[in-house]
Amino acid sequence: MTAAKPKPTPTAAKSAASFLYHALHWTLRLSALAFIVREAYRIRLYAITDYGRVIHEFDPWFNFRATQYLAANGYEAFFKWFDYKSWYPLGRPVGTTIYPGMQITSVLIWKALNAIGAGKLPFALPYLTGAGAATTVAWVTEYDVAMSLNDVCVFVPAWFGALATIFLGLLTYECARGLKITSAAWAGVAAAGIMSIVPAHIMRSVGGGFDNESVAVTAMCATFYFWVRSLRADDPHAHRWGVVTGLAYINMVAAWGGYIFVLNMIGVHTACLVAMGRYSRKLCYSYCLFYFIGTAGAMQVPVVGWTPLKSLEQLGPCLCFLIMIALEVCESRRRAGGYKFLSVANVKVYLAVGIACAAALAAVVAALLPTGYFGPLSSRIRGLFVKHTRTGNPLVDSVAEHQPATQAAYYQYLHYSTYPAFAGGALCLLGFSDAKSFLVAYIAVAYYFSAKMMRLILLMGPITSALAGLALGFAADWCVDQALLPIGGVFKWAFPVMLGDAKAEEEVEKEEEGEKAAAADADADADAADKKKPAAAAAAAAAAAGPSLGARLTRWALLIYNSVPVCLLRMAAAAKLCQWAYPHGRTFYDYSHQLAVGMSHPSIMFKGKLQNGETIIVDDYREAYWWLRDNTPEDARVMAWWDYGYQLAGIANRTTIADGNTWNHEHIATLGRALTSPEKEAHRMVRHLADYVLLWTGGGGDDLAKSPHMARIGNSVYEDICPGDPTCQRFGFMQGGVPTKMMSDSLLYRLHSGGQQKGVFVDPNRFKNVYNSKYNKVRIWKVLAVSEKSKAWAADPANRKCDAPGSWYCVGRYPPALRKLFKKKGIKKKSFAQLEDFNKKKSKKDEAYQKAYMDKMAGKGGAGGAGGAKQAQAAIREAQEKAKAAAAKLPKEQQAHRRRRRDAALAAAKAMKWADSEASSQMHKLVAAGDTTSLEAWITAQPDVVHLRSADGRGPLWWANELGQAKVAKLLKSYGCQKTLKDKGGKKPSALLKKNKKAKKAAAKKANKEEAKEVL
């Protein structure tokens, strides 16, 4: 009989199994993570690949300009920067109104890269020759990491998008620890994979989109990770991570105003844990360290200052901080006295401390409340709690991102990731812990607020990825284990657990029990210490009695689960699961890339095709700004709607009237008054404020589309613009696209369409057309008869109002001539801020205005009387007659402008490929549902979607006509959807409208016949 080969000892077998098993798993995990991080970076580079290293949109141009100023002038000058090239003539104290985190980070990266610069890196690789002699191969690699500041700012969103992916993976890993049914590491990898490409994150982190959120999401994920790390159950010193949490939170505060969400999220989580009876010294120390360090650091950011201790939306976490201290005082007394929790002595301690704290808090509030110390909820924050879709502030309501989110929006930005997220949420309820409860609280709060404001869908990206990662991590862990079974069959000694080795199972069980006991001991308090001896005695008695019935059943179940037939079934099931999951994962991957391409189209330039098929880049906006930079004096003042202020200052380097900071509602209202007033009256104002007027005139989201907001914002301060009508319904267009009298007389309409539309002319003594862009997207007019006296007065530093002698904080003032003009005309201005501040008493007139505005925006109230329809029809006829009379007066060169404008619109329409896609399917659903709110929000975010075409060549306008959605069709046309294009069969959208009308007539005729038969 052949002697049996010596088998490895159980200890050696276990060591080998553990090493090989974990080595294979970690090799797969690290390989997957490397691919994920690379993908997170690559998917954000479409804009850079297609359009070059260009800063996008509006806000990023201010951020870049501020970064340039910081790099050139240093920190001290930056925080004392009063910018007189914006918000003319008032100026803006940039140093105290900016979140500087992104600028500081970008400058540090830029300096570091340029400090490293270019160089050579030597490498040497020793090896043995065939003769056994040692030799070395050496080579030199050249590198150059130096970059311009522009390039650093362009790449920052992509870099931090990849970094946010890593932190989200760590957060998920930490929350998944202790969940026996899945591997925490695989859960982290799966969550990172989703986070890397989920559109909800990409929409704020594409290359060139140098906006605060691109850095802030990384800071938010880091803060949340360090917070849950500070609550780790099996680490007695985990609370020290509260210090790191506070430091990460300071970075978050410096980066974005959304830090309020992070602060309240951690506060809510802490309060929930206390309410569930999970208070512990670790929780108290972690939260207090975070709040104290984080708040102290946040108050050093000038734009924040004392608001954490004054603003209502931040006082909740402050109250939680005080309660945690009071609870710890009570618990310390209880531990010192050895009281039981429900004992009379302990109740007395809690009552005494509670009453003392409540009395002290009430005294402080009573003393500060009459002084106006506590600030009100801002209009944006209030909009998250009101029941309607309006905040009462027409400036806030004018921004599409501030409107409520729809289910279509969730699907658009989260797609398939929502389905495994539901399963992940259920997994959080298994093995409930402090860390996993954070995910439950996060999803509840984030969903509520994102439903109120579409912009906050950004917050859903990380939590959806984390929850989906829990579910997919479980599936990935199980599938990898099944894939390793054949290897375990070859090296049976290496995988004893997987193949049912009883001794190895016992060792594993003992280890798990030991880890569980260690974790329980680490978190035990005084009560547990009292029960330690009886528990140990009970455990010894149970061990002497032998394994329980449950333990025996578990062992038999493991033996069956690890039997060869079941192992084969498990392998087959894993293969089938992968086969089923791959197409869905691929669809999500392709959809995310498709949407990333759409999100990477900068609004400042776009691709298109002319009628002859030539592909072009429409760069009208930058060319207009360059024209201003190269052809106007350096001190030229340019009036434009506030949307374009950042780009004007950043690219043209010219003085602007207002920009996206929107810090002064009354000043924007003055700008709105100037643009919506009749030409003659407007010129009397404009000549004191500007040398040039710039308008976007390219259809879709141009200035005419924004005109209702201009009038409403202006009317909120100057009630004589639209007396008795807070929504300014008289300033707009009637049936057939005919402007109302107020619109046709306005400076905005005259400068927008003057000389290009029939019957629209501009007074040559007041304004001169000096520039029209190639595709008529931008028009620039020079203001004639400018008041040089007012310009000189505003430029004189002596006329600025400083907060102290010699201070840098000196606010400009309106020229006396403009103030006299307002006084002479009897123009009265009110402070809109009082309508938002509940600390100030509102007059009955203010309350009536607010109520009327809300009612009008909600669709309540009439259009202005019974004769409104007749007056509108009369106005239409009058306008049509005027247009016919003036048709012959249109010069030939102006006809050329109209042709170029039409070509630009057609170019945009033909830029989209004909293909059946997720986007076209989603568009068809919205059109079919008549969901104009979601459509307008989508179009505002991505203007080119109006030109989507399916494989048959049809787009949203065809579908709207076919389905009888007249309101949708009107909306699409207002955003530049072309009605002259043809589908694959050569049909125009109007053909389907006629067909739909015929079908309705036929159906009505048939119904009448059937009704007549029934009567007979």
What does each model-found stretch correspond to?
Residues 18-60, 65, 72-75, 82, ...:
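Transmembrane signal-anchor helices characteristic of membrane glycosylation enzymes that use polyprenol
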Residues 33-41, 84-85, 138-150, 154-278, ...:
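Membrane-embedded helix bundles of polyisoprenyl
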Residues 5-7, 14, 116, 120, ...:
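Extracytoplasmic
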Residues 312-334, 348-438, 524:
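Alpha-helical transmembrane segments at the extracellular/periplasmic loop-to-helix junctions
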Residues 1-47, 58, 333, 342-358, ...:
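Start-transfer (signal-anchor) and selected internal transmembrane alpha helices
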Residues 925-930, 959-965, 992-996:
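Ankyrin repeat A-helix N-terminal signature
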Residues 34-163, 198, 211-214:
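Membrane-interface coil-to-helix junctions
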